[in-house]
């Protein structure tokens, strides 16, 4: 049996992570449920009419995109646009992808859109914690330019703190018709651990454990539920994806 020292007030124990996560879940439910419902209805309207919802996220935001498109319990009418495809097609190099260069380049979004069969009845969900990088902002602008609705999943606190890297000077929430705020902090960290890099505990400690991913995934699942509810209300069977690892 391991004898643990009692945690200090700012120590990043698993229990602290659970507590912070619970607060964020409560905040999302209280402040964003109506926005999520609005977004779900807007997307469902397009899907029920035969449209596709295109989902785009870069970096760790792609984890949220993957919760919406191409997974068990999700909807087949949601398709993901991925930067990795630009490496496969030799439009970009693997280094561009790994070092984060691609997500800063507006032309990367343009290249993905050019290669996709986007229709006049489609819609977009663009996910970006910071909301400032060139590719997500360009993706939203290209969709708006085609007259397509855009739902953003982003941190308004972070986005309002930083300048856009897009030539337009716009951030994602300033382009999207509907913006769902994950509530993730500017640092995107949930808890503080020990002394800070420039001083003792008063300096704030080391930020660990991201917020944007688990908050974004919760938003993605809530969006899916809203859309499925719209299908059922319309008397239409939702095009759900089932796990390929089930024996039926």
Placement of each model-derived feature along the sequence:
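A short, well-structured juxtamembrane/interface segment
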Residues: 31-49
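Glycine-rich phosphate-binding loops that contact phosphosugars or nucleotide phosphates
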Residues: 48, 55-225
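Generic N-terminal amphipathic, Lys/Arg-enriched alpha-helix
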Residues: 1-31
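Residue-level recognition of alpha-helical structural elements
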Residues: 10, 32-36, 237
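A short, charged, Gly/Pro-tolerant segment at domain boundaries
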Residues: 233-248
